[in-house]
Amino acid sequence: MIRFKNIALAPAAVAVLLALGAVSRADDAAPAPAAPAAAPAPSAATAPTPAKAAAAPNANQGAPTPGDNAADEASQPSPPRQSWSFSGFFGGYDQAQLQRGFKIYREICGNCHRLSIPFRTLSDPSGPGFSEAQIKALAATYQVTNDTPNDKGEIFKRPGIPSDLIPPPDAYPNPEAAAATFGKEPPDMWVLAKARKYERGFPWFIFDALPFVQYQEVGADYIHAILTGYTNSKDPSWNLYFPGHKIAMPQPIADDAVEYTDGTPAKLDNYAQDVTAFLYWAAEPTLVERKKTGLRVMIFLIVFAGLLYLVKKKVWAKIH
Amino acid sequence: MSGSSTYVPKSALGRWFENRLPIVGLVHSSFVVFPVPRNLNYMWTFGAILSFMLVAQIVTGVVLAMHYTPESTMAFSSVEHIMRDVNYGWLMRYLHSNGASMFFLAVYMHIFRGIYYGSYKAPREVLWILGVIIYLLMMATAFMGYVLPWGQMSFWGATVITNLFTAIPVVGKSVAIWLWGGYAIDNATLNRFFSLHYLLPFMIAGVVGLHVWALHVVGQNNPDGVEVKNVERDTVAFTPYATLKDAFGLAVFLIVYAWFVFYIPNYLGDADNYNNANPLVTPAHIVPEWYLLPFYAILRAIPNKLLGVVCLFGAIALLAFLPWLDTSPVKSAKYRPVFRVFFWAFVADCIGLGWLGSQEVSDSTTLAARLLAFCYFAFFLVVLPLLGLFEKTKPLPASIADAVLASGAPAAQPAE
């Protein structure tokens, strides 16, 4: 049985959800500490948040607190939400931004972090879109250890070619070498943007899954926040957004660290935006193809479901 | 209800074949003329949806297995290789990983529908138990599939679950070592999990065959929970009626599935699983996939490890005893006003347990989880046995046809 009054309720329910989703966005805009604490649910479920907040100051009494951030020390603010070209239904990558981001990777991040993708993928037209000649020239500037020895049985290095993976940083040829310097190995950046998150908490995580208010860019916002979170001038390894605030990576980038040639201001926030967008592309290079395919699939399925409904209704009408 | 095949082959070849292997007649009697209660609602389309999902998971899984490397130093990068270098590899992988979640979403709708309408009651006990076996096999398959990408959560989830077996008295440690193929989770474990992950779906398919067979012997339950009395008045033919309704239900379900695959493909996964497995770094917060969270919450709520494991498996095993735990002769919650309240409380209880399973352990979450776990078991062991004795049920309609007419459906034309 189809119950028409139920079907009529559906658009109303969708409208309510969208409104709630919009509220969730408004909440994100405010630089408030973790939103879930505000959720007024009477159940025991919300109890842990106040408990944790109460416990945090005690935990911090033992550790030396940096002077100019004492107030922030007790709380762990959520990364502020950025607007990304690759979010939403039709989001894609901004080629110029990815090219700037790659420049930052190459000059800054690449000194310590691996990025295990082949040079050739940098020519991805929906990604950074470098020309074939550019890729060839770029690859040749790297020295790559050949997979197999030469005819004398020696392992040798040669200039890179587009099909090679970007080699590990010269200073840290293996993760152990980097761990010895920093206390922790700098993670490979190829899937980094998908491997990082922050807790959205109830009820926001529900809205993040819904059409029109979907939010998939938690990893990007987290990375951007970390890069801009070195707000304590006295302690270079104190980060506002890093869980626990003590981060092994000293502040990697500041204003004017990388030269931009396209007129984009050489500001930390722009650097953070650009390199994060680049890393998001590196982690999800098929995003544009995925969303394009998705649109076609969605249109097909909605039309197909509509036709099936009409046929079903017509056939069933006979027996009522 | 079945077995009465009315199939008559039209061609001489068809007759020749039908006399030797009556498979066309079997399909005809099972999926064309099979009588379907005419009052089924859309909750009854999940059987067809689940069949589709099983096939979809097997097809995408077979393609993924062609490109995946079940070796502990290469598994993680081979998944990324699928995502980046294989043509439509990203599609196959996202279809498969989200497909698992969609499969469970559908199976939970199917199970809760069965509980709401008392579909486990006589004569459908065996049909129901086969369903519980499928659910168990699905959980084992999904768990082992989640280990294969060899991310942090794969590795540590496998550690937590396989360690459950060490709780078995005397032989526990030996069982765990046997499962691991070594003294810890390593390449040997990954290899056997891959092998079993490929095997189990076909075992599921086998039990699904039995499930459908049993269904076609006893016939479908229906929202009014009264059995078919008059095939002419109470039922419609499977094709075109149920076929079209299932097709529409499936198409709507696919829209939801496609939404996850194409727009929020990593929403249901844990970000930590994009970090390669590292036995030396324990994640701050180990959580299973969402569909196992309620059981994980029950496990963590019990302070004694062995008892926790017993409760975890008991929570699933109890489902198989539902036909005898529920003492009410009335099937459908439509005619059981008190049961209906307890049913929705039970649904809320399961969702609450799931949420608690995803949270970090604290005194308050443990307390809440104990409370909800107690309610979970009380639903099966106290509420269902007692309700049947005390509940005053509403009068049942005389037949399915009477129920349909009473609900105000326009009876303009006679049945075909």
Where are these regions (language model features)?
Chain A
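Bacterial N-terminal signal peptides
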Residues: 10-19
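Electrostatic cytochrome c docking/interface patches
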Residues: 68, 76-103, 114-128, 132, ...
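Extended, hydrophilic extramembrane loops/domains of integral membrane proteins
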Residues: 241-243, 249-284
